[in-house]
Amino acid sequence: LFEAGKDLDVRAGCPNLIERIEAGLLSYGNDMSIDDTPFESGLGKYCNLDTATGCLGHAALMHKQNPGRQIRPLAVAGPAVPPITWSWPLTNTAGDTAGHVSSITWSPDFEINVAIGMVHKDHWTAGTTLHVQTPDGPRAAEVRDSFWI
C-alpha cells in the first residue's frame, strides 16, 4: 500500500485529537483500560453472550453485562478548556460523584468542548447536566446520546 501511494506521500497516520473525540474513538490507556469491561467501554454490541458459551471469559462477561458505568459523549460549556493530563471528576448538581472525563478538547466545527467520559448509570441519560471539575473551575457538561461524527 505504501509503495503504491508513494507518489501521494501515503504513510501511516491516525485521526487528530479533535476528530478522535468527535467520533468517539477510544484511546486505550486513556479512555479505557484492562480494568474496564467491553460493556463499560461501549463495545457490548460486539459480545454475543448467547453464542460465545465456550469463551474463556463467558461467565465473567455474563456477570458484567449490565454495567454501573459506561463511556458517554459530553458537551462541555464555555471557552476552550486547557489540555487534560489526568482524568477530571464529574459530579451531579448535588455535588455527588458521577464519573470522570478522560478526553476533552475544543471543537471548532461544533463550537463546544467535546469530551469522552465514564459516567455512572444514574447520570448517563442524554440531556442530563453534570459538572466537570476543570483546572479553570467547574463547567456544565451535558450528556449526549451520540458522538458528533
Labelled PLM ranges:
Residues 1-149:
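Conserved, structured C-terminal
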